[in-house]
A protein has these predicted regions:
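Conserved AMP-binding A3 loop
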Residues: 56-58, 198-222
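Gly/Ser/Thr-rich phosphate-binding loop
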Residues: 176, 282-290, 299-357, 364-368, ...
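Conserved AMP-binding/adenylation subdomain of ANL enzymes
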Residues: 103, 221-238, 246-287, 301
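Conserved ATP/PPi-binding loop(s) of AMP-dependent carboxylate-activating enzymes
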Residues: 346, 362-366, 376-409, 448-450
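Conserved AMP-binding/adenylate-forming
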Residues: 53-55, 67-118, 123, 244, ...
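Structural core segment of the AMP-binding/adenylate-forming
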Residues: 1, 73-74, 104-173, 297-306, ...
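AMP-binding/adenylate-forming catalytic core of the ANL superfamily
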Residues: 84, 113-123, 130-134, 392, ...
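AMP-binding/adenylate-forming catalytic domain of the ANL superfamily
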Residues: 160, 509-531, 550-554
Length: 554
């Protein structure tokens, strides 16, 4: 149904597109149109809070119209791509929503990315504009973007706040340089295809080179509205997602659903415990979440200096729900999601064992799931672990410019292979899903395959441990043995291998799964999209083993 396909993009098969259209999932509305309509419905309500300021929906709508019109003045056109290096500041929303309205495609890079990432992604996506945060602490993104232009190939650099470099456009000047009425007319004159690309998200992966995920206007809109319906987002919702707003979780899990329903989005550049907790208290946040390091630090701070968190109705995390409820005193729910599409949450009425240990059910009745026996397309038996495969109205049909990888990334009948190992359990007539681990994240100890995720879950319960990464270290007898890298809670000492084994024994974990080496770090190395790089951890322990071997034989 797409009018002008973008080369390198895999679009939904015609039959699937027609089916999702008939079901009312995929329609003819773009993200920009939907955001403008929400602004008209909620014009005088607060849309955005950040940087000591507040913006109503009317104000945010006018600003993003002007950004869109300014991009058109610079010579950009729908489907041109924009590298996005703006952190969690209000200007991120000005730029991203302005791109949506102009039909320009944000490439969801991070402010922390440097030449290796941007120097690859900008030419790969053929980006024409590079948005940067000009006042970023400790690094001059304006100078970086200007210096990289010969390699990146972008025509324009646009900066928010801070010092300007020659040839760099100031976002604020672009906004001020165009009349609001003229901007609205320019946006309305565009014919943006809702079936075409709205945003390029980035995959995680283990190769170090992110894969590019095309998400379409109508699929991203449906995804966001489905989350809003599932979670219960309304005009009274006050959302605060402290992690990167540019990530898929921030966009479709929190901020877009809230802005489409007329609620308030809070944004802070810092994510230290006091900022996190005080923002919740001051803004009466109802919907928030975080990852384990954020949660652990918040718990420590809350114990020392309690904040009023009574407004929170939903705290979303990938796991640790019982700990969050116990130590922060707020209702906690689990999420599973991926930039490639499918999203699952637990909900208030789910059975206690689901909320404590599982990730819930998919948000759309049109989501199709198959747990396949790893390496095959064959369904696993109910209750048996299998690779999580899915398709649906908002799930990827193929990575951008990656035909060879796409051959491996999908089943023969077109279901996306996530690489995640899951288990389905039927409770009360409904299937609920539990995340078991990554298929490629197993440790092969002799004849036994050990889930690194399982080891991490149990080790993570030790009181000294803030975060854990389990890997297989090379071993001449077993092939691999279990090694864990730990980040410790403040003031805690690392357990010895024997002490950790005794602790795991009290939890009933089989002895062959116990770690046989412990390493302690302050921070884990990460891939270019912020996930723990287990490849680098394996390299680290392998090098240490080699040095130890040489020391014994030298």
């Amino acid at each position: 149904m797409v009018r002008e396909p973008l080369p390198g993009v895999v679009y939904p098969p015609a039959a699937a597109a027609a089916r999702y259209r008939a079901a009312g999932a995929l329609g003819e509305t773009t993200l920009g149109q939907a955001l403008h309509a929400a602004a008209q419905r909620h014009a005088d309500r607060t849309a955005l809070v950040g940087g000591g300021r507040r913006w109503t929906y009317r104000e945010l709508d006018a600003i993003t119209d002007r950004v869109a019109a300014a991009l058109l003045r610079l010579g950009l056109k729908p489907l041109d791509r924009a590298i996005m290096q703006i952190g969690n500041v209000p200007e991120f929303f000005f730029a991203a929503y302005g791109c949506f309205k102009a039909g320009v495609v944000p490439v969801c890079t991070l402010a922390a990315h440097r030449e290796a990432e941007i120097g690859y992604l900008a030419p790969f996506t053929e980006a024409r504009v590079h948005f940067v945060q000009g006042n970023l602490a400790k690094f001059d993104l304006c100078a970086f973007a200007a210096q990289l232009r010969p390699k990146s190939g972008v025509a324009h650099v646009v900066a928010t706040g801070g010092t300007r470099q020659p040839g760099v456009h100031a976002l604020e000047a672009l906004i001020d340089g165009i009349d609001a009425g003229e901007a609205r007319r320019a946006v309305e004159a565009l014919a943006i295809d809702p079936w075409n690309v709205a945003v390029f998200q980035l995959s995680g992966g283990t190769t170090g080179v992110p894969k590019v995920i095309p998400r379409f206007h109508n699929d991203y809109l449906y995804n966001s509205l489905a989350v809003a319906a599932w979670v219960g987002v309304t005009q009274d919702t006050v959302v605060y997602w402290p992690l990167p707003a540019v990530h898929n979780a921030g966009m479709v899990g929190f901020n877009l659903p809230t802005h489409l329903m007329g609620g308030t989005v809070c944004v802070t550049e810092d994510v230290d415990p006091d900022t996190f907790l005080s923002t919740i208290e001051r803004e009466r946040v109802t919907y928030t979440g975080g990852v384990l390091p954020v949660i652990v630090r918040a718990i420590e701070r809350q114990r020392a200096n309690p904040y009023d968190l009574s407004s929170v109705q939903r705290f979303i995390a990938t796991d640790s729900g019982p700990m969050i409820e116990r130590d922060l005193g707020v209702p906690a729910y689990h999420i599973f999601g991926m930039a490639e599409g499918l999203v699952m949450f637990t909900r208030p009425h789910d059975p206690p064992e689901v909320r404590a240990e599982m990730i819930g059910r998919p948000i759309s009745e049109l989501d199709e799931i198959r747990l396949a026996r790893p390496g095959t397309d064959d369904p696993a038996a109910e209750g048996e672990d299998g690779e999580f495969c899915c398709r649906g109205p908002y799930t990827l049909h193929g990575y951008y410019k990656a035909p060879e990888h796409n051959k491996k990334a999908f089943t023969q009948d077109g279901m996306y292979r996530s690489g995640d190992l899951m288990r389905a359990t039927r409770i009360g007539g409904r299937l609920y899903y539990k995340f078991v681990g990554r298929i490629k994240d197993n440790i092969d100890r002799g004849a036994e395959k050990i889930s690194a995720e399982e080891v991490e879950t149990h080790v993570g319960r030790h009181p000294a441990v803030a975060s854990v990464a389990a890997i297989g270290m090379p071993d001449p007898a077993y092939g691999e043995r279990v090694c864990v890298y730990l980040i410790l809670n403040p003031g805690q000492a690392a357990p010895t291998v024997a002490e950790l084994g005794a602790f795991l024994g009290t939890q009933g974990l089989a002895k062959f799964k116990w770690p046989e080496r412990i390493e302690v770090m302050e921070n884990f190395p990460v891939t270019k999209v912020g996930k723990v790089s287990k490849a680098l951890l394996r390299d680290d322990v392998t090098a240490k083993l080699e040095r130890e071997k040489r020391g014994k034989t030298g």
